A protein has these predicted regions:
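Iron-sulfur cluster-binding electron-transfer modules in prokaryotic oxidoreductases
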Residues: 1-262
Length: 262
């Protein structure tokens, strides 16, 4: 896999515009380092796609300084290395505080499990994952055109804990006339990075997924956690990618729509 997004985020901001709304975008470690799989259904890494979608909605994208050294600490916490996890969380908080001009602008992280931990350790800023940010801030800045292509949606454990299950489903319904949430499929079993070393956990947790996908005829699924999407892709027979890709496919900026109607 290859990730060509580094050049886009090397600076502190993208497309400076003094009159635009601003958002601080912190791409998760996994989305900074992992590119697209060999047979990906999408053409851009998520970081690139998030930038273009935010700009479509009229936002100036700001990045924290030394972003490639920042981490929310989730991976360290999962290994029991709590001191390192807390230190990384503190470093991230300081960088986001500066980038957001002391909490003036919202913070977006593109991985729901990372955002969940950030909300547990950072209280003085407004933090969002993709589905909630898009639904809250971009919905009125974009023109949605529903596709008749049926799509599957996986609700991550962290989304359920944050009370955002309905948000990602509602967002998907703005994009597609047929949104399918498989029954009896809760936790995907990837469990952070354990799915890489214990794939049987992942396959057992998702044992009821593939039959439902095959029966429905759905060919693509959406979620908001890269590791979950890896396991879902492996065990469903269809690719799963970030919900941001679906939104981008089904939207135009309000400005572009107005121009088209002239």
């Amino acid at each position: 896999m290859q990730n060509d997004s580094a050049a886009l985020v090397a600076g502190s901001s993208v497309a400076r515009n003094s009159t635009a709304d601003k958002v601080v975008y912190f791409p998760s470690c996994i989305n900074q380092t992992m590119g697209l799989p060999k047979h990906s259904p999408v053409e851009q890494p998520l970081v690139n796609k998030m930038i273009s979608l935010l700009q479509k909605g009229g936002y100036e994208v700001i990045f924290p300084k030394e972003m490639d050294k920042l981490c929310c600490g989730t991976i360290w916490e999962s290994k029991g290395m709590l001191d390192i996890a807390d230190r990384k969380a503190a470093e991230l908080e300081a960088a986001l505080w500066e980038a957001s001009e002391q909490g003036k602008y919202p913070i977006l992280c593109d991985q729901s499990p990372c955002l969940h931990r950030m909300r547990e350790t950072i209280q003085k800023m407004k933090l969002y994952e993709p589905a909630e940010f898009i639904y809250t801030f971009l919905r009125d800045k974009l023109v949605f055109t529903q596709t008749d292509r049926p799509v599957a949606v996986h609700i991550t454990c962290s989304m359920r804990r944050m009370g955002l299950a309905d948000t990602i489903v509602s967002l998907a319904k703005l994009c597609s006339t047929h949104v399918f949430v498989p029954e009896e499929v809760g936790c995907c079993g990837f469990a952070g990075d354990r799915g890489f070393t214990y794939p049987e956990l992942n396959s057992y947790a998702l044992r009821k997924l593939r039959p439902q996908i095959e029966a429905s005829g759905i060919t693509i699924g959406y979620s908001n956690s890269r590791t979950c999407e890896i396991g879902l892709t492996t065990n469903s027979g269809i690719p799963y990618v970030s919900i941001a890709y679906l939104v981008d496919q089904c939207t135009k900026s309000v400005k572009a729509e107005a121009t088209d109607n002239l």
